[in-house]
A protein has these predicted regions:
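Class I S-adenosyl-L-methionine-dependent methyltransferase catalytic core
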Residues: 1-174
Length: 174
């Protein structure tokens, strides 16, 4: 964000809406309500940005970002990284994209290695047409409304916790 309080062109192009440390803490605490973080093979923050989630996650968390100016320990495009572990936690605030297209790509890319995907996403992920676009073996465990001012813009957002399971969930018929 520049001195006038508006987003820079770089932030807009990379869809950088940084999570506050307070929101990140609330999100991590919600995950910890359901899971022991030490039981995951790996923990990935796929779009680390300024590192708000890292303050509240174990030191072994792998922080990924495409922007070299961010607090990552792995510089690169999350969507081009291959993951091998099967019981991983993916947590963070990925870019959304038009009609959440990038957010869906992040979810789909994480899924083969994920046990849990916990992302800040637009409130539209509560709607049947968005839920039905998610892989059917991904089940919502919990959520937290994190709507508010993000980099000078009011955004309707929710922190969703999804768990990958063997059983398929039913599609929602409207």
């Amino acid at each position: 964000m520049n001195r006038s309080g508006t987003m820079s062109k770089r932030e807009v192009d990379l869809e950088q809406y940084f999570t506050t440390p307070e929101i990140a803490l609330s999100c991590v605490e919600l995950v910890e309500k359901h899971y022991d973080l030490t039981k995951f093979d790996n923990i990935f923050e796929p779009s680390v940005g300024a590192g708000a989630f890292l303050q509240h996650l174990p030191i072994r968390t792998i922080a990924i970002d495409i922007d070299p100016e961010m607090k990552c320990n792995y510089l690169g495009d999350f969507l081009e990284i291959n993951f091998s572990k099967q019981r991983s936690l993916f947590i963070g605030n990925p870019p959304f994209g038009r009609r959440s297209s990038i957010a869906f790509k992040f979810i789909e890319h994480a899924l083969p290695s994920a046990k849990v995907i916990a992302f800040i996403l637009p409130n539209s992920f509560h709607k049947a047409n968005f839920i039905n676009r998610l892989p059917t073996n991904l089940h919502q465990v919990d959520s937290l409304d994190v709507s508010g001012i993000w980099n000078g813009n009011y955004l309707n957002l929710t922190f969703f916790i999804y768990e990958k399971r063997q059983e398929e969930r039913e599609k929602i018929v409207e």
